[in-house]
Amino acid sequence: HSKYSRATSKALSPEGLIDAARIKGIDVIGTGDFTHPKYLNELKEKLIPHPDKSGFFVLKTMKRVADAPVFMLTQEISCVYTDKGKGRRNHILIVLPNFDAVDRLSTALQKIGNLASDGRPILGMSARDLSEHALLADSGALIIPAHIWTPWFSTFGSKSGYDSIVECFHDMALHIAAVETGLSSDPLMNWRVSELDRYAIVSHGDAHSPRKVGREATVYEVASPSYENIRDALKASARLDKTRLPKNYIAYTIEFYPEEGKYHFDGHRACDVSFAPEETKKNNGLCPQCRKPL
């Protein structure tokens, strides 16, 4: 995210993100929030394409770029809509290779909602339609359902999500690059869902302040650093044969301890109640203290 998203630090500027990346040892970091008009102008003013790494960007002020952290152009969008008679709230991560593609996507999305209201805009459109707009902006767009198990705002969310990727994205399911674990789950938990065998699994920090950068991350092995090789790595990592490794693939993810994640268990913080799913079922989904839904 950037400083233009709600509940984020004012230090989340391009410079602040690079400083955090250097401290944490991160080579590639997302800009976040590229649809926000003010932030997009700031990104265009401060970033230039990396001379050797296609699809990556560096700060103009960077004196030495050879080993400096680089940016990818990223955006999280909140899709709020009704589908099959149920309200849906779904967060989707979009990654694009250049500013021309960003401009095309922003032009399309500003007809649907107010992009200046929030760095992570809330748009009245389906996840499927957002995916189509991203691919129309650039056929190499990366579409990643964000923190897919978050109850209220995700593809598999128990409150407003779906039971499958295909049910959510329809014909666009073929174009999903990967799924993001979120802080409350890890790859081992996600691999228990057979449908996810066809998708790469990634983890990101979802930072709302510089110190949260890198609390989760994805480690890639690539022939050379570039947008296309990251894209190829995601494609190759859905069903990875470790005996015949491709040139580009996901080596591993760095995980937050999922049991400490906000949504790993059900509960009420104010009532000091925390339940595993079995306990939730025994209590009919209600808090034993206040009798409200967990």
Where are these regions (language model features)?
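Internal metal/ion-chelating core segments
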Residues: 162-213
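Extended substrate/RNA-proximal surfaces in nucleic-acid metabolism proteins
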Residues: 40-177
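C-terminal functional module detector
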Residues: 19, 37, 45-48, 59-63, ...
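Active-site-proximal loop/turn and secondary-structure-junction residues that shape catalytic pockets
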Residues: 35-36, 77-79, 147-150, 183-185, ...
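Hydrophobic faces of well-ordered beta-strands that scaffold small-molecule active sites
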Residues: 1, 29-31, 71-75, 143-145, ...
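Divalent metal-dependent hydrolysis catalytic cores, especially in the metallo-beta-lactamase
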Residues: 18-39, 142-144, 178
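Short secondary-structure boundary/capping segments
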Residues: 10-12, 43-49, 158-163, 195-196, ...
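Acidic/histidine-rich helix-loop elements
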Residues: 2-11
